[in-house]
Amino acid sequence: MATANDKLQDESIAHAIWIARYSTSVANRMIKILNDSDAELTARLLVAMDSLDADSFTVSRLEALLVSVRALNREAVQSMYAGLSDELQQLAQHEAGFQLSLFQFAIPDDVLSLHPLVGISPDAVYATAMAQPFQGRLLSEWADNLEADRMARISNTVRQGFLLGDTHEQIARKVRGHANRGYQDGALQMSRTNAGSIAKTAVGHLASTARKSFADANDDILKGKQWLSTLDNRTSKDCRIRDRLKYTLDNKPIGHNVPYLQGPGKIHFCCRSVETYILKSSDELGIAVGQISDSSRASMDGQVPSDTDYQGWFSRQSFTRQSQIVGVTRARLIRDGGMSPDDFYNDKGEWLTLDQLRNRDAQAFKDARV
């Protein structure tokens, strides 16, 4: 029978997968907000350059002519920031409720009757996350930095284009990129990438803040926490070395000397790590014999869940959850075709299509009857 701590670990891993996917969708929406302004930004840039020729070109004159471009850039980044703030407010609502339901699911009812849980305010979670820096800056400061970075890339590209003798249209394409390349070869592409990283990191930052807020409110039933890293070929060295390491509630190492630093979800940009809290045993909670059932006492053993890798965790999940994570066909390939989750990636960590998988292992598809 799974103990309360086993349940916390399993559901924390499942939730980490959901958070990672959600952060990617948020990042894509934020990038789209910026992209929606690019056509108008390019048009304004062309108008500005029409008033400037190579003979009269100076940096100060360029900056003066880019006023309307700068205003549109500011408007685009502010729209992205407003959109991201709204996403985070909605996530705070979800995470506050999830943390409570997670512990209610893991802890037996008769234990909860003796040690009721304390809920947390979504508004407080959001306010705390917005007031705490991640990767050295507040979210509002990251937005300001993104605005300045985009504008600097535009100005530098225009200046370089004039020095090289490029036409205005060539300069505009260097700024935005080429349509037949998905606009990924322009000067603005790095800013898009940075915007996506900021969005993903902000989501992880808020989820981590919600976990900590709930733990702080219910620290009477907790005795520590364990770092859980997503182990694959994209895992950072900082997260890989901390996987499964235990810490006290105030971030002191237990049985090792690896520092906690900013913690999972915050230790670096786009961090996918989470942590699971370790419940005290019924004895440590001072619950006398007879106050709870024998099964509840066995569930509240206070032991740290045994080490598990992603494949071991995945195999324990229901087919429904497996299908939600990798899709029905891939879930069948794992259950009946002998594949593992690692088989879905190439050696560069890229997600393989079903056609690519079929070319690699046609027998697995036959065995799974897909």
Where on the chain are the PLM-derived regions?
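N-terminal leader/targeting and assembly helices and adjacent pre-domain segments
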Residues: 1-181, 282-370
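Acidic, glycine-rich two-metal-ion catalytic cores of nucleic acid-processing enzymes
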Residues: 186-291
